[in-house]
Amino acid sequence: MVRAGTATVFPQAVSLAATFDEDFLEEVADAISTEGRAKFNAQQKYEDFDIYKGLTFWSPNVNIFRDPRWGRGHETFGEDPYLTSTLGVRFVEG
């Protein structure tokens, strides 16, 4: 979404999980989806289909982060299965 103009940037998933705030995470996901719909509607209205104008969302990875050698741990909600499942559900609901 960034190449298609301005977009809101939120912290990595592991940082959001560190808040332990399920309601906040749902609000973040809602903001992301609302902004995405707005960009899509604007593209359709103005027929702006140039290269790099498609919508790409980098959502959290719900794998459990167990091995620190895995280089994508920052994309997860961490190593707690309960927290990861709870936050994953709330992100989808948002």
Regions found by a protein language model. Give the residues of each.
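Glycoside hydrolase catalytic-domain context in secreted enzymes
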Residues: 1-94
